[in-house]
Swiss-Prot record:
CC annotations in GO: nucleus
DNA-binding region(s) from the entry: 121-180
Alphabetic keyword roster: Activator, DNA-binding, Nucleus, Transcription, Transcription regulation
Protein name: NAC domain-containing protein 59
Induction: Rapidly and strongly induced by H(2)O(2) treatment in both leaves and roots. Accumulates during senescence and in response to wounding.
Species of origin: Arabidopsis thaliana (Mouse-ear cress)
One Gene Ontology term of the molecular function aspect: sequence-specific DNA binding
InterPro entries: NAC-dom (IPR003441), NAC_dom_sf (IPR036093)
Tissue spec: Mostly expressed in root cortex, phloem, atrichoblast and quiescent center (QC), and, to a lower extent, in root endodermis, xylem, pericycle, columella and lateral root cap (LRC). Expressed in roots, cotyledons, very young leaves, senescing leaves, mature flowers and pollen.
Compartmental location: Nucleus
UniProt note: domains: The NAC domain includes a DNA binding domain and a dimerization domain.
Amino acid sequence: MDYKVSRSGEIVEGEVEDSEKIDLPPGFRFHPTDEELITHYLRPKVVNSFFSAIAIGEVDLNKVEPWDLPWKAKLGEKEWYFFCVRDRKYPTGLRTNRATKAGYWKATGKDKEIFKGKSLVGMKKTLVFYKGRAPKGVKTNWVMHEYRLEGKFAIDNLSKTAKNECVISRVFHTRTDGTKEHMSVGLPPLMDSSPYLKSRGQDSLAGTTLGGLLSHVTYFSDQTTDDKSLVADFKTTMFGSGSTNFLPNIGSLLDFDPLFLQNNSSVLKMLLDNEETQFKKNLHNSGSSESELTASSWQGHNSYGSTGPVNLDCVWKF
């Protein structure tokens, strides 16, 4: 499914007329205002239940604990957005059931009015998550902003129960100073390692490009951990598991995407630093001269010796 951005600001699935498309430069983030959430996302969702947005997931807040929500989200590092259907505490009442297995969401403060121009279009409620059961629950740093339609956008042909049923929830975790905390979360549950590697196995990594491996890396990941993991995969492919060889096989090196190596210098530098340390250690233990050991290793690995010189300039630019 293709994702398009219309001039109205919606990031939606499906086709958009060419005249309506806009291009966003790299670095743009999904950070809508309260009014934009109401106008461009919640209202279309209430009118059409099939409406979806690339940046907003769908979740049942009564079945998911707040610390598990980042894994359910589509995008986000500091805050996560969801379409939610509010569960009624009583079938004939209007009170919302805000309990989960581990605790409950409790409203705090006064609801904030949201205006489009001079017209009231929605309301924002702030809630805090408590572990345990009321009234002895323990307050946590998980906060939720819940957006609902109101005023101008409270559609006349829907009952009060129906129009309030669908809301947008923005969830985030705060520090002790009240600022939003950046959270680097791992792969979602059941995807703790690459399905690509599990299905093919380490022995079949040779001939695989690093670009291919990267296609399975989640956006919610720690960069340092990713670098170390990629180095491990890189070394396994080039040297083989448990190998003591000091120089890479040129054929294996050429299997990797040089643009990736050029643009991800930290991975290559970690690999080279590690190999240099190992080289010196083995050189010291063997008592061989550096020139003898280098020449011997090179001859044992150079399977492309008859093809002439190989240009690896793009690999070493870091």
